[in-house]
Structure formats: C-alpha cells, structure tokens
Amino acid sequence: MRQDAVFTYVLSHDASVELAIYTLSGRLVCRLGPQGQPAGFQQLSWDGRDQSGRLLANGTYLYRIVAVGGDGESEVRFRGPLSVLR
C-alpha cells in the first residue's frame, strides 16, 4: 500500500468504533480502537501494518468495523474484503 486505507462511514449516534483486520483464515493481524466518535461523517485510516508494526504482505484480508452506541446496547457491524497491493 502506498497510502493508508481509509474507511469512510456515517454514524447516526455517538459511538465507540473499532476496526479489525484479519487474514482469510480468521487470524487477527491488527486492531485499531475502540475510540469514541461523534455522530456524523467519520473516517478511520489504517497504514497496512500489523500489531507489531510490520507491513503486511500483498494479498486479500478481511476488515470488520464495529460501532457500539453510547447505551452499550446498539451495535452496527460492517465487514468486507480488503486487498493489499504494493
């Protein structure tokens, strides 16, 4: 990746948001957050590195974004594939 991967989304309420990156076999390689974010247009950036700061190899990974509302009850999940190409 020459640039950070940027995930863009809209929150209808204030929420605690976490981004996780997994291998296709389900191994967690990176977790960002949780971090509090206000309602509205939001972005999270990921630099292509694992938890130890190493650049991930080219390939396909899975991302998951979880947003938990201030009440601790409401939860929204987004997930999908992510390709790393350098």
Model feature map: region roles:
Residues 5-13, 46:
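Aromatic/hydrophobic beta-strand junction motif of beta-rich domains
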Residues 15-18:
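Short beta-strand/loop motifs in extracellular/secreted proteins, especially
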Residues 2-7, 35, 58-86:
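C-terminal tail/sorting-segment detector
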Residues 43-56, 69:
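Signal that preferentially marks extracellular ectodomain short beta-strand elements
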Residues 29-38:
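Solvent-exposed serine/threonine-rich low-complexity stretches and specific carbohydrate-binding patches
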Residues 22-29, 61:
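Short, glycine-anchored, charge-dense loop/turn motifs used at functional sites
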Residues 1-3, 13, 38-39, 52, ...:
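Surface-exposed loops/turns
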